[in-house]
A protein has these predicted regions:
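Short N-proximal segments of mature Sec-exported proteins
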Residues: 31-94
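Bacterial N-terminal signal peptides
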Residues: 7-17
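Short, structural beta-strand-to-alpha-helix junction motif
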Residues: 26-34, 84, 102-106
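Sec/Tat signal peptide C-region and signal peptidase I cleavage site
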Residues: 17-25
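Surface-exposed, polar helix/loop patches in the mature regions of secreted/periplasmic/lumenal proteins
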Residues: 85-122
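Positively charged n-region of N-terminal signal peptides that target proteins for export
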Residues: 1-7
């Protein structure tokens, strides 16, 4: 029974030395634009930023699935099941460079455009 408090103390002490374990990134509160999203996502060494980007993109896609009418023809199909999240992100970053006119649009709107243009259902 004495090992439980010692174990908890050990875990708490480890976590106190790893503040980045709880670090978060988010889009700036006053800017949910495509440009702000790209800025957050483009650094491959920023683990928290990349994690946010993957989660945000997944959330946009899941919202699309949840809000699509059951009998509606799907507009987005990820046919290549071997493509990684990072590969999709790299395509998105390249796509935004080719479409700078969308930088002021909301990031979610640009992601939906990207998904429908690059992953259309056939």
């Amino acid at each position: 029974m004495k090992t439980l408090p010692v174990t908890l103390l050990f875990i708490v002490s480890i976590l106190s030395f790893v503040p980045s374990a709880f670090a978060q990134k988010d889009l700036p509160a006053d800017d949910a634009s495509t440009a702000a999203f790209v800025e957050l996502c483009k650094n491959p060494d920023d683990i928290e930023g990349r994690s946010f980007c993957f989660g945000f993109g997944e959330g946009v896609y899941q919202q699309y699935l949840a809000s699509r009418a059951i009998n509606a023809k799907p507009a987005i199909c990820f046919a290549n099941k071997t493509e990684t999240r990072n590969e999709v992100l790299q395509k998105f970053l390249a796509w935004t460079k080719s479409n700078p006119q969308l930088n002021k649009d909301q990031a979610a709107k640009s992601l939906m455009r990207f998904f429908t243009q690059n992953y259309p259902c056939k």
